[in-house]
Regions:
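Acetyl-CoA-dependent GNAT
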Residues: 4, 8-83, 92-98, 102, ...
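Conserved G/P- and acidic residue-centered "switch" motifs that form tight phosphate/ATP-binding loops
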Residues: 86
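Short amphipathic helical patch at the helix-1/turn junction of helix-turn-helix
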Residues: 78, 112-113
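Short glycine/proline-centered loop/turn elements that form peptide/ligand docking sites
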Residues: 92, 115-118, 135-140
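Conserved catalytic-core motifs of GNAT/GCN5-like acyltransferases
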Residues: 108-111, 123, 128-145
Length: 165
C-alpha cells in the first residue's frame, strides 16, 4: 500500500469531508453530512472521525460512533484517486481494533442497496447482511443493514440494536 497515515480529523478538515460525503456517499440525495455535523462528531467523546492522509491530501475518512454494546459506522469514503490501494481496509481495521480495545464488540452499518462495490467490500471484511430497510435514504433508496462481531471477525449478531447515528 502507498504511504498513508491514519489520524483523527482536524476541525479544518470538516468542509472537505462534507464535500467528500456529498460526492461519494450521498450523491443524488439531499446532503445530510454538513461540516457542522461532522465537527459535532469530532468533538463528541463517543465518536471518531478518522482520516487517511497521503502527504497533505485526504485520501479517505470514516465516522464511527460508539455505543455501550454496538458501534455504528456512519460514513466511510475513499477518494476515487486512492481506491484499490487498501485505504478502506486499513481504516476499517483500525476502527475494528479500536472498538475491540474499547470493549465494543459489534460494529453495525448501513449502505445503499445500489452500492454493490461497498456491499462486496464489507462482505470480504466479515460483515453479514442483517436485512434491508425500504426508503432508508430520504424515502428514496433502500439500505442494506450489516454487522460484524469483531471478537470472532466473522459472525454478525441477529437482532442487532443500532445506536443513534
Amino acid at each position: 500500500m502507498d504511504e498513508y497515515s491514519l489520524q483523527p480529523a482536524r476541525i479544518a478538515d470538516a468542509r472537505r469531508l462534507a464535500v467528500m460525503s456529498q460526492e461519494l456517499v450521498e450523491a443524488g440525495l439531499r446532503p445530510a453530512w454538513s461540516a457542522s455535523r461532522i465537527t459535532w462528531h469530532m468533538r463528541h467523546p463517543e465518536s471518531i472521525v478518522l482520516v487517511a492522509r497521503q502527504d497533505s491530501s485526504i485520501a479517505g475518512f470514516a465516522i464511527m460512533r460508539y455505543g455501550d454494546d454496538v458501534a455504528h459506522l456512519n460514513l466511510l469514503a475513499v477518494d476515487p484517486a486512492h481506491r484499490r490501494r487498501g485505504v478502506a481496509r486499513r481504516i476499517m481495521t483500525w476502527l475494528e481494533e479500536t472498538a475491540l480495545t474499547a470493549g465494543t464488540f459489534i460494529i453495525g452499518l448501513e449502505l445503499r442497496a445500489t452500492n454493490e462495490a461497498a456491499h462486496a467490500f464489507y462482505a470480504t471484511m466479515g460483515y453479514r447482511e442483517l436485512g434491508r430497510v425500504s426508503g432508508y435514504y430520504q424515502g428514496i433508496e433502500q439500505a442494506i443493514r450489516m454487522a460484524r462481531d469483531v471478537r470472532t471477525g466473522r459472525d454478525a449478531v441477529p437482532g442487532l440494536k443500532q445506536p443513534a447515528p
